[in-house]
């Protein structure tokens, strides 16, 4: 558990205690351990995640990451539930394993619109990636609870960050790497607001579960 092992309970409202990069490394190390188990077929190990974990799922397929950590790691498939797609990778080389994004039309925490551009760009580069947008659904559409509001959480609806091949995330306007918590807070000031809605949609919940069973 990438949170518990670091004594972190939540990244809501800050997004800097545990990074996507750190959890991707955790995922690769977990793959390496699982692949040595005599009862596990390394060619059938897939990855899925939600929100921040969805970002981990998505970018664990990014070849610059794969090449930097372990080129022998290859997930069978990547299923990302409402990931942050508001990154524009300088290098758009991704794994040829199937990648699929499930996201809500009304998501204002990790908005769907950047995912459309992200998927289109990768498809044009022959990536095996697809997107499902659930109509009338918010972040956490697969929860079994009504939609509520969190006034403290970051709303990324107006953000689109550049991602260099070296893995640096650049501020929207200054092109300065957000390489520490201070610079990240500074970068967020240009586009992030507070307040998001999240909660379940019964139709999207059942549909996403059925899709996951087939895809994984």
Indicate residue ranges for each PLM-predicted region:
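C-terminal catalytic histidine-bearing segment of alpha/beta-hydrolase fold enzymes
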Residues: 128-216
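Acidic catalytic loop of the alpha/beta-hydrolase fold
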Residues: 106-110, 139-140
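Short aromatic-enriched loop/helix-cap "lid" or pocket-rim segments at secondary-structure transitions
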Residues: 10-11, 92, 142-147
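Serine-hydrolase catalytic machinery in alpha/beta-hydrolase-like enzymes
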Residues: 1-37, 189-197
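Short beta-strand/loop motif that positions the catalytic acidic residue
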Residues: 95, 100-103, 107, 134
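Primarily recognizes the serine-hydrolase "nucleophile elbow" in alpha/beta-hydrolase
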Residues: 18-96, 108, 113
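Short alpha-helix in the alpha/beta-hydrolase fold that links the catalytic acid
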Residues: 110-121, 146
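Short beta-to-alpha linker loops that shape the active-site pocket of alpha/beta-hydrolase fold enzymes
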Residues: 1-5, 84, 137
């Amino acid at each position: 558990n990438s949170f518990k092992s670091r004594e972190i309970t939540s990244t809501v409202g800050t997004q800097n205690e545990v990074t996507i990069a750190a959890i991707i490394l955790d995922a690769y190390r977990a793959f390496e351990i699982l692949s040595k188990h005599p009862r596990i077929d390394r060619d059938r190990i897939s990855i899925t995640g939600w929100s921040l974990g969805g970002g981990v799922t998505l970018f664990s397929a990014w070849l610059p990451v794969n090449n930097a950590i372990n080129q022998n790691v290859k997930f069978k498939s990547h299923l990302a539930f409402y990931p942050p797609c508001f990154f524009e990778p300088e290098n758009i080389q991704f794994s040829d394993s199937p990648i699929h994004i499930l996201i809500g039309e009304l998501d204002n925490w990790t908005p769907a619109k950047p995912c459309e551009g992200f998927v289109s760009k990768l498809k044009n580069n022959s990536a095996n990636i697809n997107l499902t947008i659930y109509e009338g659904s918010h972040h956490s559409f697969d929860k079994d609870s009504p939609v509520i509001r969190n006034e403290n959480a970051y709303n990324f609806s107006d953000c689109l960050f550049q991602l260099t091949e070296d893995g640096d995330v650049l501020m929207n306007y200054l092109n300065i790497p957000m390489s520490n918590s201070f610079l990240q807070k500074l970068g967020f000031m240009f586009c992030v607001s507070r307040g998001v809605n999240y909660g379940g949609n019964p139709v999207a919940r059942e549909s996403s579960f059925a899709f996951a069973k087939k895809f994984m």
